[in-house]
Amino acid sequence: IAERGQSLSRAGYNQYGFGQHTRTLGDVQALYVQLGKTVRRLRLKLGWTQDVMADRSGLHRAHIGEIERGQTNVTLQTLKTLADALNVRITDLLKGL
């Protein structure tokens, strides 16, 4: 992980070998916005309105709108629900994040 003679922390890793990344609130918000754009793009590719997406996913239409605008935290369960409704993998929703 670290180059010879370089400490783990200087190489950007903690004691367990995991990267030490500090994200700001703005960084996290940008991830949710990008996720929302991906969900919207995939929904529109299927020709679905938010109402149809709500019916297919079991999520409330207003919640789908919040997700697409990046205005809400998205749980792993919600990611799975969205992926299943859109017939994609969770990783497809997370590409580019």
Which role fits each region the language model picked out?
Residues I1-V28, D84, L94-L97:
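Short, charged recognition helix plus adjacent turn
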Residues H21-K45:
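A short, Lys/Arg-rich alpha-helix, primarily the initiator
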Residues T75-D92:
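DNA major-groove recognition helix of helix-turn-helix/homeodomain DNA-binding modules
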Residues V39, M53-A54, I64-I67, L93:
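Conserved hydrophobic/aromatic packing and binding residues within compact polymer-binding modules
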Residues K37-R56, T81:
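Short basic helix-loop element that most often maps to the first helix and adjoining turn
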Residues G58-T72:
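Recognition helix of helix-turn-helix/homeodomain-like DNA-binding domains
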